[in-house]
A protein has these predicted regions:
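Absolute protein N-terminus
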Residues: 1, 22-23
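Bacterial N-terminal signal peptides
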Residues: 8-15
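Sec/Tat signal peptide C-region and signal peptidase I cleavage site
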Residues: 16-22
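Short, glycine-/small- and polar/acidic-enriched structural segments
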Residues: 23-162, 173-177
Length: 177
C-alpha cells in the first residue's frame, strides 16, 4: 500500500511537472511588415518558449491571411486594426486581443517624378494591397481628400514589399507603403 501511494505520488508529481513544462502550440500568420518584427524577435529570443508557448510563425500575404484563419491553418494573425472589421464582415469571425504598435506617419505613397499632384495620378497605375488593408484605405482616403476615388486610378493588388520592388524596377506609376 505504501509503495502504491508512493508510486501514485511520484506519478502525480511527474505529471504535474510535465504539465508545467508542456508548451501550448500556437500558429500565427503575419507579413514581413516592420511593425511585426517583435514577433520574430520574441521567438528567436526564446520569450514565447519561456512562457510555455511553441509558436510557429508563417508569412502569409495580407490578402489571404483571413483564409488561413478560416481554414484553421493558423490560429492567430498579426494584421492592421481595420482588417479585423473587414474579415468579420466577410464572415471570418475574429477578435483583436492586443495592439502591437501604432503607426504615426509611416504609411505613404511613392510616385514617379512626373506626378506633382493627385490629379496627375488620374488613369495611372497604383500598387496597393487588397481592399480592407491599411495601404488601400490610405490610398482611398488620400484620393477622396483630393476629389478622386479608386476608380480614377488603376489599382494593382500588391503587398508593400513587392510594390516597392516593382516601383524601383520601373513598374507602376505609384506604390503605397
Amino acid at each position: 500500500m505504501k509503495k502504491s501511494l508512493l508510486a501514485g505520488a511520484a506519478l502525480a508529481a511527474f505529471t504535474l511537472t510535465s504539465a508545467a513544462h508542456a508548451e501550448t502550440a500556437v500558429s500565427l500568420g503575419f507579413s514581413g511588415w516592420t511593425g511585426f518584427a517583435p514577433l520574430t524577435l520574441a521567438k528567436e529570443a526564446g520569450i514565447f518558449k519561456k512562457n510555455g508557448l511553441d509558436v510557429t510563425l508563417t508569412k502569409i500575404p495580407q490578402a489571404s491571411r483571413h483564409l488561413a484563419l478560416a481554414s484553421g491553418d493558423i490560429q492567430c494573425a498579426a494584421t492592421t486594426v481595420e482588417t479585423w472589421i473587414v474579415w468579420n464582415a466577410a464572415g471570418v469571425k475574429t477578435k483583436q486581443i492586443f495592439q502591437m504598435d501604432k503607426s504615426y506617419g509611416a504609411d505613404g505613397i511613392a510616385v514617379r517624378a512626373d506626378v506633382n499632384s493627385f490629379a496627375d495620378l488620374k488613369g495611372k497605375t497604383v500598387a496597393a494591397s487588397a481592399p480592407g488593408t491599411s495601404p488601400y484605405f490610405l490610398l482611398a482616403f488620400m484620393l477622396a481628400k483630393n476629389g478622386m476615388t479608386t476608380k480614377d486610378v488603376k489599382v494593382v493588388n500588391m503587398e508593400p514589399g513587392p510594390a516597392a520592388q516593382a516601383f524601383v524596377a520601373g513598374q507602376n506609376d505609384a506604390a503605397m507603403t
